[in-house]
A protein has these predicted regions:
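Short, conserved beta-strand element in jelly-roll/cupin
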Residues: 34-36, 45-62, 101-104
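Short strand-connecting beta-turns/loops that link adjacent beta-strands
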Residues: 26-27, 48, 67, 93-94
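Short acidic-glycine-tyrosine-enriched beta hairpin
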Residues: 66-82
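A short hydrophobic beta-strand segment most commonly corresponding to one strand
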Residues: 52, 79, 93-110
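Asparagine-centered strand-capping/turn motif at beta-strand->loop junctions
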Residues: 88-91
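A short, N-terminal "cap"/entry segment at the start of jelly-roll beta-barrel domains
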Residues: 1-32, 42-43, 113-144
């Protein structure tokens, strides 16, 4: 495998949230999550993976399975070990740009995500994904 480069850039969206994969190796994936203010995801964990998130813009509040908050502002991050249940919300007054690093332990796990109700996801987000919104043509968030 060769070295590769990437840019922290993602389209603006009209609502909801998006995820754009930036690069990957056999044991690591990196991506950029983009959430409009107020948007959150569901309580979940990642078997076989540790995750790191760094706030590039906006504000994120991460919650553990007991719903205890940890507020992160621009330039702050959190590391989440395998089997740690969490969810997060864009809690600032501007969209949240969140750099994500996923490190796999050993070979690729068969189950990539499990929510609090036991629902499992086995497919990896390898394409640009927008949930509950549309991209805004010609408008982008990027690290400057």
């Amino acid at each position: 495998m060769e070295a590769s480069t990437f840019k922290l850039k993602t389209p603006h969206i009209t609502g909801g949230r998006s995820h754009i994969p930036l690069a990957q190796t056999e044991h690591m994936t990196i991506g950029l999550n983009y959430y409009i203010p107020g948007r959150k995801n569901k309580l979940h964990t990642h078997p076989g993976e540790d995750h790191t998130f760094v706030v590039m813009d906006g504000q994120a509040t991460f919650y553990n399975k007991d719903h205890q908050p940890t507020v992160l502002n621009k330039g702050e991050g959190i590391i989440l070990p395998e089997h740690h249940y969490y969810y997060f919300q864009s809690t600032g007054d501007r969209p949240l740009a969140l750099f994500r690093v996923s490190a796999k332990k050993g070979t690729k796990p068969k189950v990539l995500r499990v929510d609090s109700e036991g629902n499992k996801r086995t497919d990896e987000e390898i394409d640009f994904v927008v949930v509950d919104g549309e991209t805004v043509e010609g408008k982008f968030w990027e690290l400057t």
